[in-house]
Design a protein with these regions (language model features):
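Short aromatic-enriched loop/helix-cap "lid" or pocket-rim segments at secondary-structure transitions
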Residues: 44-49, 227-231, 264-267
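Walker B catalytic acidic pair
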Residues: 220
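N-terminal "arm"/small-domain region of PLP-dependent enzymes with the aminotransferase-like
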Residues: 2-76, 86-87
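Hydrophobic "anchor" residues on beta-strands that sit immediately upstream
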Residues: 181, 215-216, 252
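Alpha-helical packing segments of well-folded alpha/beta enzyme cores
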Residues: 15, 81, 316-326
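Conserved core of the PLP fold type I
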Residues: 67-212, 223-246
Length: 326
């Protein structure tokens, strides 16, 4: 087909008429399509409907430790839900804080806390002349909206099939003390679906930040979201790798059940070092007495354990797989 610049007036008018007829044909179908990305379909949402029946007015509402989920307490989440999400994120329970329905909310709070109170005793970012974040591109627009909102300068980092350009990441992180963080989606990263290579993960863990308050924001949103159960991507555990490299406090890992149970009505968590957990506790216990523990209990009783989560994800995969194989 010729480019529009090469077409004559008659050819352009003919093409315009043809396209208008095609448009009218599609318009006549009366379709109402929601093109928003990241929203599970109705058949996927139906998979979790039995969860709404596992707790009712006659249910025992106590945790395994005997705490009443209807009341205040358990600022870091009920123990069994912390264990469930720890297993999902492949970390230790003591490193996990279970929050509300949104991991994005935790990320926002984590940046806001760093702006207002600093990071583990460092100077609050709001008092610094310049704060920069590295942003692998293409990436998640909602990550970038958070840093944009707080006036943080964003630096694009190119991506390839192995993940971010680590030569560039190391150059910025190891030499510029105004670089305070980097956004990462290490597994099945949108929109390309790439997973970070083992080498990339280990190079992240072995960074030597010029800034003592530099943090990796590791959004492991798709950690169990495999299309094929027998063949799927695996990555080294970033918390373990950072600890081995002598950088135990350098990473915040985020996760949720938003694409597992109900988007907007799931449970979310942050996993990080014990030192970071303690710093977060000092602020979070002022901010909130406890999140929705009834929803946490509901998720635990529905999924029961990590095997229940994985079996549920296989049902999602069965719905989605034909779309990838079409």
């Amino acid at each position: 087909m010729k480019s529009y610049m090469q077409m004559s007036r008659e050819e352009l008018l003919s093409l315009k008429a043809s396209l208008e007829e095609e448009f009218k044909t599609e318009e006549a179908k009366g379709l109402s399509l929601n093109m928003a990305r990241g929203k599970p379909g109705a058949s996927q949402l139906a998979l979790s409907m039995p969860m709404l029946d596992v707790i009712n007015s006659k249910s025992d509402m106590k945790t395994l430790l005997g705490n009443d989920t209807r009341n205040y307490g358990d600022w870091d989440g009920i123990g069994e839900c912390r264990q469930l999400l720890a297993d999902m994120m492949e970390v230790k329970k003591d490193n996990v804080i279970v929050c509300g329905n949104s991991s994005l909310n935790i990320m926002y709070d984590t940046v806001a806390r760093s702006m207002i109170r600093g990071v583990n005793g460092s100077t609050p970012w709001c008092k610094l002349d310049k704060v920069k974040f590295l942003c692998p591109v293409p990436g998640y627009d909602r990550h970038f909206k958070i840093t944009e909102l707080f006036g943080i300068e964003m630096i694009n980092i190119p991506m390839d099939e192995n993940g971010p350009d680590m030569d560039l990441v190391e150059k910025y992180v190891n030499n510029d003390e105004t670089v305070k963080g980097i956004w990462c989606v290490p597994k099945y990263s949108n929109p390309t679906g790439i997973t970070y290579s083992d080498e990339v993960v280990k190079r992240f863990a072995n960074l030597h930040p010029k800034a003592e308050d530099f943090r990796i924001f590791w959004d492991n949103a798709y950690c169990i979201h495999h299309i094929y159960d027998e063949i799927h991507d695996k990555i080294p555990n970033i918390l373990e790798e950072c600890e081995k490299a002598g950088n135990p406090d350098m990473v915040y890992m985020f996760g949720s059940t938003s694409k597992v149970s109900f988007p907007g009505s799931g449970v979310s968590a942050i996993a990080t070092s014990l030192a970071n957990v303690e710093f977060i506790r000092q602020h979070m216990t002022v901010q909130i007495i406890g999140h929705d523990k009834i929803n946490q209990l509901r998720h635990v009783r529905f999924f029961k354990d990590i095997d229940g989560l994985k079996n549920h994800m296989q049902k999602h995969a069965e719905i989605l797989r034909p779309k990838f194989e079409a």
